Design a protein with these regions (language model features):
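Short secondary-structure capping/turn segments at boundaries of alpha-helices and beta-strands
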Residues: 18-21, 53-54, 62
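Flexible, charged surface loops at secondary-structure boundaries
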Residues: 3-7, 55-61
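Active-site-proximal helix-loop-helix substrate-binding element of RNase H-like nuclease domains
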Residues: 30, 34, 38-51, 61-164
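Short glycine-biased active-site loop of nucleotidyltransferases that positions the nucleotide triphosphate
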Residues: 22-25, 102
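Conserved "right-hand" nucleotidyltransferase catalytic core of DNA-directed polymerases
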Residues: 1-16, 25-26, 31, 40, ...
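Ser/Thr-glycine-rich phosphate-binding loops at phosphate-binding pockets of nucleotides
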Residues: 15-22, 68
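Glycine-rich loop/turn
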Residues: 49-56, 218-221
């Protein structure tokens, strides 16, 4: 079915990554497995082997396929890689396909929905926890993590084969462009006034107490702006 897609190459990819022990930080890629479906060529890269550009094509004539692509594209950004030109996110397309019908829309849910062999949920969690632990990993653990990543790629290949006939490709590619934008938002974070935020954290208890007192008194008053060195 993938051969019917109007692209010279179709690349399915998955990253494993961790956050340096701090949730919310930028991803730190651990490994990547990718497969070009027309030729069957596969790439397996471990941390330190990534290089300055992806090892596979990402131009206009290549379809880049992922599940929840903002995560994979976040790894692209962390590595300084350019964005793929054509992106298909099967997570987004599955959500669109079952909109209003299912509340669970992860990779295992998508595979089960289409009657495909799915990964074991317990094993998936164990491997994800192993990766998020941040290492160091033994040689055996490295092999296991890469093999786990490769199984996700194989699962995506199966999922693409059954979802391809349901795709509204022009709109799907537009949604893929949005996931690239979402990865930029996640990479850059939300800009905030850090000094004022620090003051809020420092005086939060006092602020709450004064607001409660004002509420109980039925009164409101002008509040002076928070400035460094002054409590509210």
């Amino acid at each position: 079915v993938t051969l019917d897609l109007p692209f010279a190459a179709v690349v399915v990819a998955d990253f494993e990554f961790e956050f340096g022990g701090r949730d919310g930080e930028r991803p730190r890629p651990v490994c990547m497995v990718a497969k070009e479906l027309r030729t069957g060529k596969e790439w397996r890269l471990w941390r330190g082997q990534f290089g300055s550009v992806p090892p596979f094509p990402i131009g206009q004539d290549t379809l880049f396929v992922a599940f929840n692509a903002s995560a994979e594209l976040g790894c692209f950004r962390a590595l300084g890689w350019p964005m793929p030109k054509r992106i298909l996110d099967l997570f987004v397309e599955f959500r669109n396909h079952v909109n209003g019908l299912l509340s669970e829309r992860g990779l295992i849910d998508a595979l089960n929905y289409f009657g495909l062999d799915a990964l074991d949920a317990r094993e998936k969690k164990e491997m994800r926890d192993l990766v998020l632990g941040g290492g160091p990993w033994s040689e055996a653990q490295r092999r296991d993590i890469l093999e786990y990543c490769a199984r996700d790629v194989a699962a995506l290949e199966r999922l693409l084969s059954v979802m391809a006939p349901h795709l509204d490709l022009p709109r799907a590619l537009l949604r893929g462009r949005y996931m690239a934008a979402a990865s930029a938002m996640e990479h850059n974070g939300v800009p905030i006034d850090v000094p004022t935020f620090a003051l809020l954290l420092k005086y939060w208890t006092e602020i709450q107490d004064e607001l409660i007192a004002a509420r109980q008194a039925g009164a409101t008053s002008e509040r002076r702006p928070l400035t460094k060195g002054h409590s509210p």
